[in-house]
Amino acid sequence: MTEPTLAKTYDPKSIEANWYETWLDSGHFACAPDSKATPYTIMMPPPNVTGSLHMGHALTFTLQDLLIRYHRMAGRDTLWQPGTDHAGIATQMVVERQLAAQNIARRDLGRDAFIEKIWEWKAESGGMIHKQLRRLGASADWQRERFTMDDGLSAAVIKTFVQMHREGLIYRDKRLVNWDPKLMTAISDLEVEQIEQKSSMWHLKYKIEGTENEYISIATTRPETMLGDGAVAVNPDDERYQHLIGKMAILPLSNRPIPIVADEYAKMDKGSGAVKITPAHDFNDFEVGRRHGLPLINLMTATASMESIPEIPEKYQGLDRYDARRQILADLDAQGLVEREEIVENVVPHGDRSGVVIEPWVMDQWYVNAEELAKPAIKAVEEGRTKFVPERWNKTYFEWMRNIQPWCISRQLWWGHRIPAWYGPDGQVFVEANEADAIDAAAKHYGKTVPLTRDEDVLDTWFSSGLWPFSTLGWPDQTAELKRYYPGDVLVTGFDIIFFWVARMMMMGMHFMDGEVPFREVYIHALVRDEKGQKMSKSKGNVLDPLELIDQYGADSLRFTLAAMAAQGRDIKMSTTRLEGYRNFTTKIWNACRFL
């Protein structure tokens, strides 16, 4: 029998594809729940269903694959659980753009028909990222692939919401949110891009009530919000304003009196030392307002136009926020109430997808009591039950968790897990697993059957992805896989989602899995930058496409390069020169094997 011979020239494209299919067909990547071998689990961070492979993906999935392959070869029963995230806003935007190209508006189509369009899009295009991961050589257990909107995970989300609501951990509250007036939804802090820019700051004069010619000066970059001011704050130790504390200032244009309050939020060495407090349009002002019992005056509509309310003079009602700014400044100037204008460096929040300026906006939303959930999650890391590698990331985790704020989980979208809440005729809320249970609960409450209206909002995608380590294993059912593969051995991820995903998995996992952590280690890897150490971006033209690199150099060359350069704590400066070197190395290995 003739021994097969290796080709003279190493062709990674054909060789890698052939071996990958061989391993896949043989079930080499599958876990073995009935095995007596010790299990080893990695939960794949689910990429967005809209996504395509980028260098960050290439790094994190290469590192995960190395760990899985090593432990598989060492005889462990390995589970690398794959899946994709439904990516609420991103997916809805993709399908909306496709419909817009056909001159179809989402709202004209209607909710049910629009959601059906999204499912059609997913069936056609939603699996792209996993096909690309296979080209990278990722040896995940693909037969166990999950989606955060599949039936099993949806059931887990509903149970979680209902149970947490009954435990008092989910509640409805009127608070400030990051409102995107273009997408017309609240968005998370992760979806807000803070952009430094030069802005005008205007110094305005508010007259002191009961005086002829005494004013207090405040500075603002957003004069259009002054109509919603609830107070002027001064530092309690500022001697300049001691005589004014407790008195009233007259709000220009609307002539509404507002109190002058003492609060340490006002800094004596910043500006005039006096600050306008607009609780409904600034996150810091909101907290000051709560301390002093100030009113919440929502000045704007969902599209960021001025509301038609008594607090806003009629001439400004209906104006876009920036048109209102110009008109208000002109009127203040005409009354001699603008002291001066200066140009300052300012950080302005923008929606990372819409590109528009975010408006802090007061509205009723659903919240999670994250402070309560964080307590055991903090303790678990303090006790070393979950370890961060490198260890310095403990500090980042602790700082955020110990200062955690209520988590806004409702989104004004159509695509996502719809909130299981129904409202009675008087606004009474009924949170149940399904409509039938809600109708029964309402009938008991009212003594008769009444019509109910379901909540229109969906859940933040981080809510469902926070359940990923155990919902993918069959929870809430107590499956054999759940008992065998939970908790995971290691989570591999970047530092940028410690707050948004790692922390939420810790909180949710420990709450629903009897205090057991979701993973024993969290390996935080570096970022992939260009060869000069700059962040890759399309605008800079320095983006390296991993799929193009795989075509040119082979998947093993790319994986070898990333693994070799992934030293702890140092960002990877990626260059094609490095790739060429490791491609040559793989060729040498091939030639050595031919020689043998």
Q: What would you call each of these model-derived segments?
A:
Residues 1-237, 278-291, 295-309, 321, ...:
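N-terminal, positively charged nucleic-acid-binding surface of large information/translation enzymes
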Residues 245-302:
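Extracellular/luminal Protease-associated
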Residues 2, 48-82, 97-99, 180-182, ...:
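Conserved active-site neighborhood of enzyme catalytic/cofactor-binding cores
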Residues 206-212, 236, 250-255, 424-426:
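Short acidic, glycine-rich loop/turn motifs
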Residues 105-118, 307-318, 542-547, 571-578:
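Short beta-alpha connecting loops at secondary-structure transitions
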